[in-house]
């Protein structure tokens, strides 16, 4: 069996950010490039950190008092970035990269060739390959989905939902009506729809900025889930019982759940 390498799955090019960029600039770059993270390079063009949409959201720029808001507006990418940057050689086996990401809870790796950054490999890249493979074992969504997820009512404010996400570490929250029917999903990227990161009034509800829920049958295959994520550019899907589609979702399956499955010793990715 031919070994799939990182170079076979990665996407070339790196969206860069300067250490002194403001959080407003970071948010603008994330939105313009439709990415979840930016790599930060110093003056010598060496990677020194990474900042994500979740980092921006976790910053208390959502604070209601003017003093906190002023502090956050003065903060830079350097102050919120994570370091050091996790990197991988371009000719590393893709299975090894997937295992490393799963074990370390890493969503992306900076790809280097001859010590120079040439691209990025992320969970989405593995999903694209999974969706295209017909040799995958047919595990079901219900086998690997997460039973726990963050949920809020349709009357919840954006600021309250964002703080709950920041405090709990969840990247999104499922919005439901009084009966538990899923109405949408609110994520960190939805926050970027607010221009110039102005203070968000407490009167703005999650229903005003959430995106429509993407749902899948609990008996669907992982390949079907991966294809759905790729087609809709989503990182997570609500898992439902089709006979009770208007009830509270059974769980959530994320792109990271799929990569974790790839890292299992008996996965086709770990063979050959």
Q: Each PLM stretch: what is its role?
A:
Residues 1-13, 52-85, 98, 122-150, ...:
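Tandem CBS (Bateman) regulatory domains
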Residues 16-35, 41, 87-105, 112, ...:
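The conserved cystathionine-beta-synthase
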Residues 30, 38-54, 101, 109-124, ...:
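A glycine-centered beta-loop-beta connector
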